[in-house]
Each structure stands twice: as C-alpha cells, then as structure tokens.
Amino acid sequence: MQVVSSATLPPTVASADLAIVGGRSSDEDVIKYSAIQTIKQEQQQQQQQQSNTALPSYNFPFFNGMQNDFPPNRMLYNDNTMQKSENDHFTGMNLSTSASSSGNSTSSKDQSRRQFYTESSNSSGNGAAATSGSNGSSSSTESKSDVFNISMNAFAATPGSKSEDHNIPSFNMLSSYYTGALKLSNSTSFANPDPYQILGPTSKNLAHSGSGQTQLWQFLLELLSDKRYSEVITWEGTQGEFKLVDPDEVARKWGERKSKPNMNYDKMSRALRYYYDKNIMAKVHGKRYAYKFDFQGIAQALQPPTASHPQDYFNSHAMGRIAPDFSSWTSANYRSLNIAGFNNGSTIFNPSVNYSAFGATGTSNNLSAARAFPLYR
C-alpha cells in the first residue's frame, strides 16, 4: 500500500470519504483514504471486465472492417467450451474452432491468429490509484484474452485438421461451387451448332439444281456451301441468314462467273432485289450486307409451272401436244357437206313454203320464175 501525503490530495475530496478517528493524526487519515480508493478502483475494474466478457454470444468480429453483429440464426455457440460453428450456405463449409485445434496449434499458427480485445479506458481514476488498479487487473486480462482468440483454422474445410496445405485446395474447390463449376459444365453442353454442317448439304444441292445457266442466288449458295469462302461470305445462324463480309469480292467473283469484269456490288445488289418478289431471299433490316434465304420460296420456284389460266393451254407445250391430232387432216372438202336434195333450187323458196315474195307473177324483176339457190356448184 502506498502512502501519500495530505498535500497531494485532490481538492474535490469529500469529507465523507475521510474516516477520522479521535486522537489520530492526519497522516493516518490519508492512509485510510488511499486504502478506500484502491478498493473502489479494483471494484470498478472488475465490473468493467465482467461487462466485457458478458457481451452477446454472437457479438465479436472476425476481421477488421467486418460488421460487428452477425445474425443469431447463423451463429451457434456453446458457452461451456466456447465452441463456435457456422454453416455457410454459399459454400457448405463448417467454420468451427474447438479445443483440439487450438491445443495442437504450433507457434506458426499462433502468429497467424487474429486477436480481438474489447478494452475501455478508465477515466474516473488518476494518479497512483489508477496505476495500482491497472497493475492489479493485468493477470485477469491475460486469462480472459483467450476468449477473443479466433484461429485461422476456422476457415478449414474439416474441423480440427492439422494440415493447412491440405485445406487450401479444399477451400478453393468449395468456394468456386457457385461461381465456376456451373459455368464450366454449361459451356460445353450448350455449344452453338455449326451452320455449315446443317445448311451445307442443302445449299450445295440447291446451288446445282435445275438446268441452264447459274443464277445469282445459286452462286451465293455455292459460296456458302464451302467454308473456305467464309472470309467473304458467311452464314449467320441456322435460319438461312447470311452476310456479305466482303461484298466487293463477292461481286468480283460473280463477274468472273458471268464474264463481266465491270461487275460491282451496286450492280449485284440490284440483281438481288429481283429475288425479293420471287420469295427467294429478303433483306435483313437493321443489318448491313445481311440477307436471308427463304428455302420454301426456293422450293416453289424450282417446281415446274402448271396451267392455271385458259391462255396457258395455247402455249408452246400445249400446242405441241395438240399438233399430232391435226396432222392427219388435209384440206377440207366442203362439197361433201351438201345434203342430198338441197342442191336443186326448185325445192327452196317456192310458193309451197309460203315465200310469196319470191313466187309472185307479173313482177318487173321477173320473180315469177322459181329462184334457184345452188349450193357450191
């Protein structure tokens, strides 16, 4: 116990704090006051230490900068062994610390631990009384410090494991469950189909269909059927859409096929507009140099025409079928059409059939005689 003189007493000391006994000197009173102050300081520090250890069971942080409060439904504590376990619903990890893992930790593990202390400064006492109070509570503070030690082994995939090198790949594998595993599995199963494998045989057959000269739409299908020309013209998907990557080069190749060295894209694009009304292809709106084939329209265009109007029966094909029917006919002998008995004029327009105008007598135009109308004499 340290004895202080009366000269060093603070001016704010109340008279009730001094226990004055009759017949004693003032130095004994000062010693009694110092003993009372020391007891009060120890009681206050014990109350502060109890308040520090009486924090809620989920109210201390893992790292600097993290939130101090964790939801109670995620943190479970056992007050007897101070064992903490947390199930992370993202990675499925069991984050826990136990006495076995902390007991087997080496000096290297002690260096990697993060210690968190909850300290509060003593602002009520000063002087020698505060110094003695801090020295008296140092041993109790060290005994309570293990409560706030959070081992880095809590982030191991298996509780109580001794090998940290073994836990690192396990943690990386579990942490990438929702970020990398699904992405890698989905990237191979949903690959885009190759349009050249799907549309290649069809475009090749249509490019060489029909007889006669190759048309422009057939020439484009011929280029699209060969993947070597993908640098100048290529498919855009599997629905018949294609794009002229180098329209000038496509026009030059079309000019070589038609022996027209002055061919350019402007002339070729005008020829492509002719196929819009034929439902062979169409321009893709909003995209430059993009077109789309209509395979149903191409199939209808390749079908032979059928006679749907009366004038279609008198075309060259119809007349070719009718000509053999008239080949055996010669010049018409219309005299064979005369019926017997009608070549005599007396039997036609005589008075017996009431044609009086022709049978009247005494007329000036000599109509009394029977008029004969010979037929093809």
From Swiss-Prot:
SMART domains, A to Z: ETS (SM00413)
Main subcellular location: nucleus
Alphabetized InterPro entries for the sequence: Ets_dom, ETS_fam, WH-like_DNA-bd_sf, WH_DNA-bd_sf
Region (Disordered): 72-143
Keywords annotated in UniProt: Cell projection, DNA-binding, Nucleus, Transcription, Transcription regulation
Record's GO cellular component terms: neuron projection; nucleus
Tissue: Expressed in the A-neurons in the male-specific genital sensilla (simple sense organs) known as rays.
Compositional bias ranges of the Low complexity kind: 96-109, 118-142
Phenotype upon changing residue 263 to I: In ot417; defects in dopaminergic neuron fate. Reduced expression of tyrosine monooxygenase cat-2 in dopaminergic neurons
MF terms (GO), sorted A to Z: DNA-binding transcription factor activity, RNA polymerase II-specific; sequence-specific DNA binding
Presence of the UniProt keyword rRNA-binding in the record: no
Subcellular location: Nucleus; Cell projection, Neuron projection
GO biological process, one term: cell differentiation
DNA-binding region: 214-294
SUPFAM superfamilies xref list: Winged helix' DNA-binding domain (SSF46785)
Keyword Transmembrane helix: no
Disruption phenotype: RNAi-mediated knockdown abolishes expression of tyrosine monooxygenase cat-2 in neurons in the male-specific genital sensilla (simple sense organs) known as rays.
Biological function: Transcription factor. Probably binds to DNA sequences containing the consensus motif 5'-CGGA[AT][AG]-3'. Positively modulates expression of dopamine pathway genes, acting as a terminal selector for differentiation of dopaminergic neurons; may act in concert with homeobox proteins ceh-40, ceh-43 and ceh-20. Required for axon navigation in some interneurons, perhaps acting in the same pathways as basement membrane protein nid-1 and unc-6/netrin. Plays a role in the differentiation of the ventral cord pioneer neuron AVG. Required for morphogenesis of the pharynx.
Record-stated family: Belongs to the ETS family.
Name assigned to this protein: Transcription factor ast-1
Annotated organism of origin: Caenorhabditis elegans
Classification lineage: Eukaryota, Metazoa, Ecdysozoa, Nematoda, Chromadorea
